[in-house]
Amino acid sequence: MTFKKLLLICSLFLVLPCCAKDVVNNKLDYINLDYWKNYNDEILINHMQTLYQNNHDLRIAALKTKQAEENIRLAAANQLPNASFDGSFSRVFRGPKTVFGNVVIPKYVQNEIFLPLNASYEIDIWGQNYLTRKSAKKQKEIAEQQERATYIYITSSFAADYYNLVKVDALEKNLEKIIILQKDIVAMTEKKYNAGLAPINELLEEKQILVKFEKDMNTLKENKKLLNNEMVVLLSQNSDKEIEHTGFDTLKYPTTPDSLSTTVIQHRPDLLSSESFAKKAGLDVRIARRDFLPKFILFGNLGFNAYKWNRIFAGETFLANAGIAPSWDLFTGGARLAKYRINKYEYKKAVENYEKTVLTSIQEVNDALVETKTTKANLDKANEEFNIECEKHALSERQFNIGDSSKLDEMRSEVNLYITKQRNIAATIDNVISTISLYNAVGGIDYTKTENL
């Protein structure tokens, strides 16, 4: 027998860690690392794992789910009997005399010792407590979907900030080259002006262009700092060190589909949450309807009622009773009817909200698809524009080499090339971020896998 007990205990110790690991893995699935691996960026994956471990919003969402689980246990407790011990000890001082009909009891002083064990149980004839527990379970489903929505929002927001940081960094490096070139142009134009070969307007225009580029650089540095600060908060880091990120030239991102079935919205947490809320509201209506019915409570107590310490557990002090107590609120001033109507209207609101969420979900998916198509088309045009500018600059270099144009013309052509590169960088990152927007719109599923569509 002892061997069997030891075997059972050991098996429990083996099973419990596995169960705990499953819970962790289930939460880690909310991050959906398989999707983020489509970007082929180990730095991003590492940041996502740090988010999972440290982000405070994710922890708060997890705690809300745990609260909902405890509410289920609270509702389940109402389906079980209640037991309590309500003992008392008192010293009784009676008046001069106590009259019971013809019997007169003179004044006296005595101890009263009462040691009862009380129990009660509400008979769930109408299933009200059972429905309350089902309602609590629906609330847990809502909390779980809200937690999943938080994961999708936080990871998508971080990824968007991450690639915006990549964009700002690439734009900043490219703009540094533009500013260096523009400073050289200003210096050469100033020499031409001093030599009487250029008007003052030409020099002022070049200086004005340089000032504009320097203002753009200040804006980029500000945006870079703001993005870095926001990402530090998301990662729950205490330092303001620069967030590590990949380079622009190594970017990879998934291909987006041309169209998606409307059934893809079934994965969205807001839709699942609104569906669970509508079901919960329906259960609450049924619960409120049962408030009109009587309740039946079984009760009883078992214990001792003695007057002397040395006779507490004597046979004659034993006390026990049991019974059933029907309870029916005949008039409450319309409170129960008002509560029923409130829950009924809440149910109707929940149904309307669910139908609205369906339409909103379809709209957001379609909007995200339009965004991906638009950014892809803009990227194609940006690439085409950049290629044309490359050809123009190559032509400008050939003209300079054969003496058909000045060095200033060749440098201005190079500036235009880098300016076009700026637009190309922005269009590329916009296309990357549109893939993240689509991921968010479809409910955090990997849309690159056909089985999810």
Task: Place the predicted regions along the sequence by residue.
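Periplasmic alpha-helical coiled-coil/stalk elements that build and connect Gram-negative outer-membrane
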Residues: 138, 145-261, 371, 375-378, ...
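Bacterial Sec-pathway N-terminal export signals of envelope proteins
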Residues: 19-71, 249-279, 330, 358, ...
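Hydrophobic, lipid-facing positions within transmembrane beta-strands of outer-membrane proteins
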Residues: 47, 113-119, 260, 320-324
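Acidic, low-complexity, intrinsically disordered peripheral segments
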Residues: 31, 423-453
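Outer-membrane beta-barrel architecture
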Residues: 73-74, 118-120, 287, 325
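Small/polar (Gly/Ser/Thr/Ala-rich) solvent-exposed segments
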Residues: 59, 82-109, 120-149, 272, ...
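Sec-dependent signal peptide recognition
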Residues: 3-9
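Bacterial N-terminal signal peptides
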Residues: 9-17
